[in-house]
Amino acid sequence: MKIAVDAMGGDYAPDEIVKGIELARDAYPDLEFLLYGQTAKVQPLLQNTTRIELVDAPEVIAMEDEPVRAVRRKKQSSIVLAATAVREGQADAFFSAGNTGAVLAAGLLIIGRIKGIERPGLTTTLPVLQRPDQSSFVMLDVGANADTKPFNVVQYAIMGQYYAQSVMHVDNPRIGLLNNGTEADKGDMAHRAIHDALANMAEINFVGNVESRELLNGAADVVVTDGFTGNATLKAVEGTALSMLKLIKGEIMSGGLGGKIGASMLKPVFRQVRSAMDYSQYGGAVLLGLKAPVVKTHGSTKAETVKNTIGQIQELLASHSADQLGTYFAEHSDEMAALKENLKA
């Protein structure tokens, strides 16, 4: 298995990307890497080139670049060349910590969608804090599509089910629809239509509507939503977690000697909470619905997160989930067409 890597994307690129790839190379002996970046900057950072091939990419798509325009114009950028390697069969998956929009655009325009999938969904893994039998759940779409139709969300449920089964190893994943209440008639017309469609799909273990306050309590294994709501929810969850940790730390520091003594006794608890909320252990966000895995991590990614994300990509490749999705949508093309028409009505 070979992974095409954008070495120039991210706040700490190329240093932390290269370190992370070398950690991943040592951790996963079955993997090889095509590292795309500016040779003059990347070459001096490589300590050991075993199973790592550096490919010169003289152009860089910056975080502030307009995504689609940059992908179309910067043909020699690390993002475009890495995605092209996947399209041409030189690599099996694409990894980047760079410009999110450009990574998504490269995935769509260069690698391409699985036939039958109208819009790929960006999928992320989040922690579950209140269930001993469940450590995490996946949510999609978290930002690939700001304008999403009900039919797209129904397809997200199918894609999320396959991801949970093949990568997270959940036998019969519970699928929930993010909504403003748990009752079946909650939400606008679009959400009610999505709810009814999912409830009538025998192959989906649909548990109904899920409220955002119950996400981290393990209300479902897969939560589906439109890209705008999903992205806002993801940022709210991450921001709230960081704010709470800062609040607790501030109260401890202002509590004098007694507060500091109490904090020292609770250190193991704080460490567990911080670890549970640390996104780096869950890898990156996967653009589900493409012909090959495309995985995007936070721009602030460092070496350990890179390594963990590569492990996630290895699971994706080993599961052949893209092939499974392709087979499903090919075999159910008539049902999908009928469902799309029903949801338009």
Curated annotation (Swiss-Prot):
Protein keywords: Cytoplasm, Lipid biosynthesis, Lipid metabolism, Phospholipid biosynthesis, Phospholipid metabolism, Transferase
Pfam family of the protein (one): FA_synthesis
Self-association state and partner proteins as the record states: Homodimer. Probably interacts with PlsY.
Gene that produces this protein: plsX
Organism for this UniProt entry: Levilactobacillus brevis (strain ATCC 367 / BCRC 12310 / CIP 105137 / JCM 1170 / LMG 11437 / NCIMB 947 / NCTC 947) (Lactobacillus brevis)
Protein name per its UniProtKB record: Phosphate acyltransferase
Protein family (similarity comment): Belongs to the PlsX family.
Subcellular localization: Cytoplasm
SUPFAM superfamilies given in the database record: Isocitrate/Isopropylmalate dehydrogenase-like (SSF53659)
Positions of transmembrane segments: none
